[in-house]
């Protein structure tokens, strides 16, 4: 199954996340199909960018969003 979730990049104690489309069987930071945005929780205000067009495309072909990505997509 295809899922839309966060993958962590950045340094130790300085998280930065990509919003990616991946297979649900892959590890959190494993390979991904497409990167559709990013999330920086440390900046003020929190920096969120998600490509709505690509998000809607992947939802249309059956990808499920994680709970965190659902909350972030409402804020973006």
From Swiss-Prot:
Reply yes or no: does the keyword Protein biosynthesis apply.
Answer: no
Q: Which UniProt keywords apply?
A: Ribonucleoprotein, Ribosomal protein
Is the keyword Ribonucleoprotein assigned to this protein? yes
Q: Name one GO molecular function term.
A: structural constituent of ribosome
Pfam families per the UniProt record, alphabetical: Ribosomal_S16
Q: Name one GO biological process term.
A: translation
At the top level of its lineage, which domain of life is listed? Answer: Bacteria
Provide a GO CC annotation, any one. Answer: cytoplasm
Q: Which family does it belong to?
A: Belongs to the bacterial ribosomal protein bS16 family.
What is the protein's given name? Answer: Small ribosomal subunit protein bS16
**UniProt source species:** Helicobacter pylori (strain ATCC 700392 / 26695) (Campylobacter pylori)
Per the UniProt record, the lineage of the source organism begins with: Bacteria, Pseudomonadati, Campylobacterota, Epsilonproteobacteria, Campylobacterales
State the gene name recorded for this protein.
Answer: rpsP
């Amino acid at each position: 199954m295809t899922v839309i979730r966060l993958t962590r990049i950045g340094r130790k104690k300085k998280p930065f996340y990509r919003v990616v489309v991946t297979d649900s069987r892959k590890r959190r930071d494993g390979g991904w199909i497409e990167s559709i945005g990013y999330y920086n929780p440390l900046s003020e205000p929190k920096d969120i960018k998600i490509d709505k067009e690509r998000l809607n495309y992947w939802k249309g072909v059956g990808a499920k969003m994680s709970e965190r990505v659902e909350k972030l997509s409402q804020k973006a």
